[in-house]
């Protein structure tokens, strides 16, 4: 990537270039006979990165497919194979792609190994087991206990840290090489700094008006998911943060051509097949999405070189917390980003996100006195979203749209 002059590029240009280049690098690695890993979105990438294994992310790949309206064909294929439409849309589309290996987005090379961490959901177990079984490849698992009391216990940290040692052993067997602990610590330093830079970007949304729309945040999120162990990821976020600070100094809003009248938190994953529609309807009302439970999940904090610190970070995901922890996370986002209300995406694909929303929403209304509206949708399956319902939900909780 050294041939590219990043200094002459905007952060958006860097984002687009790096996302495409990262997948191309994985395809070239596969063609050379190098190892490729499919990993869940918040699995500990640091281990594969340290061993020179190219890592790509099925969830992010399906995001690109869904946003380009290419998911229905894959979903239909999966359902014809016997996968119920109650299963996560990411899983169905990815399992179909594994068979057909064609899509409207970037083609993703098949894996030589899969790595999952159930700190976001348990659907991953059977999803990744099916991949490993079908392709006859190893499946590496990091099992993270659920923090029912929203407190990460020392026992849980030790349990996960011991599994990290097993991941190291498996990687040594797979690659035929000794694990490079010096490289591992260096990767951890890079990833921790990238996470800090990403956290700063999400925090800058607290400015009024916000220099960044949350929908732009969803796009930039691709880097922290796919490249958080690579230096170019941090370069992009530092460029982004400089741009955002300049916009704040100039009092400019991230929604071009529209005054920021209201600020909301988006609860849940984006509705990728209708990302443009969900954004434009909000913009029509002068509503800027400035906070979200989704992008900040990748702002991992740990001490480089410390396995227990790494284990604690990967065990502390928002989805892995009990009801009080989930509530506190949302309360802090609403207060920190000065939100006037909340939109909750009742995402058919993500039961982990949805099942707590009703009670959390009630509690937020009672204690913070913020209006909350919900809409039905899906992160990948367009059949579960109604544009009219979304518009109606906003109509009865928002001022009149701009002329």
Predicted regions and their residues:
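A charged, amphipathic alpha-helical module
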Residues: 2-35, 161, 165-294, 300, ...
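A short, acidic, amphipathic alpha-helical segment used as a generic capping/interface helix at domain edges
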Residues: 101-103, 321-338, 355-359
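Redox- and metal-dependent alpha/beta enzyme cores, enriched for Fe-S-associated oxidoreductases
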Residues: 51-76, 269-329
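An N-terminal, globular interaction/scaffold subdomain
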Residues: 42-87, 92-95, 99-103, 127-128
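Conserved small/polar residues in nucleotide/adenosyl-binding loops
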Residues: 396-403
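Short, flexible loop segments at boundaries between secondary-structure elements
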Residues: 369-385
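Internal, well-ordered alpha/beta segment that forms a basic, Gly-enriched binding/recognition surface
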Residues: 108-173, 179-181, 186, 193, ...
């Amino acid at each position: 990537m050294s041939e590219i002059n990043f200094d002459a590029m905007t952060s958006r240009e860097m984002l687009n270039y790096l996302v495409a280049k990262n997948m191309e690098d994985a395809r070239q690695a596969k063609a050379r006979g190098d190892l490729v890993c499919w990993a869940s979105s918040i699995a500990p990438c640091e281990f594969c990165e340290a061993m020179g294994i190219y890592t790509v992310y099925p969830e992010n790949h399906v995001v690109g497919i869904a946003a380009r309206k290419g998911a229905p064909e894959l979903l239909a294929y999966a359902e014809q194979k016997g996968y119920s439409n109650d299963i996560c849309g990411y899983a169905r589309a990815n399992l179909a792609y594994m068979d057909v290996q064609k899509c409207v987005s970037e083609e993703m090379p098949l894996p030589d190994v899969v790595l999952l961490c159930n700190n976001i959901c348990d659907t991953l177990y059977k999803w990744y087991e099916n991949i490993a079984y079908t392709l006859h490849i190893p499946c590496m698992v990091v099992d993270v206990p659920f923090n029912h009391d929203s407190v990460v216990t020392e026992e849980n940290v030790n349990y996960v840290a011991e599994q990290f040692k097993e991941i190291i052993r498996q990687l040594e067997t797979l690659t035929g090489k000794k694990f490079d602990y010096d490289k591992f610590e260096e990767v951890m330093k890079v990833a921790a700094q990238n996470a800090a830079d990403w956290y700063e970007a999400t925090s800058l949304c607290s400015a009024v008006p916000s220099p960044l729309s949350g929908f732009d945040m969803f796009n930039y999120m691709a880097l922290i998911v796919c490249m958080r162990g690579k230096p170019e990821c941090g370069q992009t976020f530092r460029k982004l943060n400089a741009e955002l600070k300049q916009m704040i100094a100039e009092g400019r809003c991230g929604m071009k051509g529209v005054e920021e009248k209201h600020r909301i938190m988006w609860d849940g994953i984006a509705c990728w097949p209708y990302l443009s529609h969900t954004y434009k309807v909000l913009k029509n009302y002068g509503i800027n999405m400035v906070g979200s439970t989704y992008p900040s999940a990748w702002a991992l904090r740990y001490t480089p070189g410390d396995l227990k610190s790494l284990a604690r970070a990967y065990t502390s995901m928002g989805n892995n917390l009990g009801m009080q922890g989930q509530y506190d996370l949302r309360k802090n986002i609403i207060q920190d980003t000065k939100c006037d209300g909340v939109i909750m995406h009742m995402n058919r694909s993500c039961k982990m996100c949805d099942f707590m929303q009703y009670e959390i929403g009630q509690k937020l209304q009672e204690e913070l006195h913020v209006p909350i509206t919900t809409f039905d949708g899906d992160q990948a399956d367009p059949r579960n979203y109604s544009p009219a319902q979304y518009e109606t939900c906003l109509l009865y909780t928002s001022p009149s749209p701009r002329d």
